[in-house]
Regions:
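Short Gly/Pro-enriched turn/cap motifs at secondary-structure boundaries
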Residues: 63-66, 95-97, 114, 150-157
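A short core secondary-structure module
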Residues: 81, 85-139
């Protein structure tokens, strides 16, 4: 909500790559809180909220990008869990050693699932399995097979993940079968807002750097003293106009972001049901 938006702007302005990590974790927390079983919430939410573990979102496959109906990853029932097999690409912070565990939310199909997006289910697949006492157990059958080469944000590891190169990665169903896309959209909607805040933070950083450069760079004469000494370029009217244009756009972005954040707060936390519904 509002606090997250303010902190998100600051984090993204200072390090947009690192901010992606907690953006995904925050979205996963909301998805698990809304749709996961009591047992899964008890096992995973505390560690995710504390930042001891981080979360990812696994949708895209080599043949399935914007058309998620083409997803081929499989989930085979086995007792109280499923065996996940498939490959996911473009997974932000899909592999790293910043935390002890990484919790993957993975879209996959069960054997009896209908075709298209109506047959997609959502599964929680931890990098390390969790023992009954909450300690970490053996490594799950999920591996990072490569890191994507990107034009920017290199400090954010964008992974290609292979699930089930061996016996199959152990995964736990979130909610009900064939409702995975519905649950994943809880996380995706959080991420969409977070990416908007990311743009705000980067824009604020760009303005601050442009302002600092305009104060430091000495070039040309002051228009009111053409025979005087050279001056910092912030003294030139057109440079000041460009800086004010940047600042006004950033302020407009900030206002929009904080209004939306306040609506998030109202939708989730207002004491009056009518107020909550009005914010949705």
């Amino acid at each position: 909500g509002s606090i997250r938006a303010g902190l998100g702007e600051i984090w993204n302005a200072s390090n947009a790559a690192f901010a992606l990590c907690w953006l995904l974790s925050a979205g996963q927390i909301h998805a698990l809180d809304a749709a996961a079983s009591d047992e899964l919430r008890e096992t995973y939410l505390t560690k995710l909220v504390s930042g001891e573990w981080t979360g990812t979102m696994n949708l895209t496959e080599p043949q399935a990008g914007s058309d998620l109906g083409l997803i081929r990853s499989k989930a085979t029932p086995e007792g109280d869990h499923y065996r996940i097999q498939g490959q996911k690409i473009f997974i932000s912070f899909g592999e790293h050693d910043l935390t002890d565990n990484i919790v993957h939310l993975v879209l996959a199909r069960t054997p009896t699932a209908p075709e298209g997006v109506k047959g997609i289910s959502l599964f929680l697949v931890p990098k390390f399995l969790v023992n009954d006492d909450g300690s970490l157990g053996e490594r799950n059958d999920v591996r990072c097979v490569s890191i994507e080469h990107k034009m920017g944000i290199h400090a954010s590891p964008t992974a290609v993940l292979a699930f089930g190169d061996g016996p199959g990665a152990i995964g736990y169903l979130i909610g009900e079968e064939n409702r995975g896309l519905e649950y994943m959209f809880i996380m995706m909607n959080e991420a969409r807002f977070g990416v908007g805040v990311q743009g705000l933070g980067v824009a604020e950083r760009a303005y601050q750097q442009a302002l600092a450069n305009a104060k430091d760079r000495v070039q040309g004469k002051d228009a009111t003293a053409p025979k005087g000494p050279s001056v910092p370029i912030i003294r030139h009217p057109d440079v000041r106009r460009m800086l004010m244009s940047m600042k006004s756009r950033v302020e407009a972005m900030r206002a929009l972001a904080y209004v939306v954040a306040a609506m998030f707060d109202q939708a989730h936390r207002a004491s009056d049901e009518a107020a909550r519904n009005a914010a949705h």
